[in-house]
Amino acid sequence: MGMRMMFTMFLLVVLTTTVVSFNSDRESNHENRRTSNQITRGMWDECCDDPPCRQNNMEHCPAS
């Protein structure tokens, strides 16, 4: 009975780890998708050098 209980606990731990890992991976995929849709830092640097663009996007440009 001891071996059967240990095997059951092992399966429970493996299943729990797999489910948690799968859900975490799904969340990170959404974060990656959001990040890939955003403008890169280099593009914001170019925008911040242009006064009209800087005026329209002040939240992305540091104060000078």
From Swiss-Prot:
Residues that make up the propeptide removed upon maturation: 22-41
Signal peptide boundaries: 1-21
Source organism of this protein record: Conus leopardus
Region (Lacks the Ser-Xaa-Pro motif that is crucial for potent interaction with nAChR): 49-51
Disulfide bonds: C47-C53, C48-C61
UniProt KW Signal keyword: yes
Alphabetically ordered keywords of this record: Acetylcholine receptor inhibiting toxin, Disulfide bond, Ion channel impairing toxin, Neurotoxin, Postsynaptic neurotoxin, Secreted, Signal, Toxin
Tissue: Expressed by the venom duct.
GO molecular function, one term: acetylcholine receptor inhibitor activity
Protein role: Alpha-conotoxins act on postsynaptic membranes, they bind to the nicotinic acetylcholine receptors (nAChR) and thus inhibit them. Has possibly a distinct nAChR binding mode from other alpha-conotoxins, due to a different three residue motif (lacks the Ser-Xaa-Pro motif).
One Pfam family per UniProt: Toxin_8
Keyword NAD (UniProt): no
UniProt name for this protein: Alpha-conotoxin-like Lp1.7
Domain notes: The cysteine framework is I (CC-C-C). Alpha4/7 pattern.
Superkingdom: Eukaryota
InterPro entries: Conotoxin_a-typ
GO cellular component: extracellular region; host cell postsynaptic membrane
Record-stated family: Belongs to the conotoxin A superfamily.
Subcellular location: Secreted
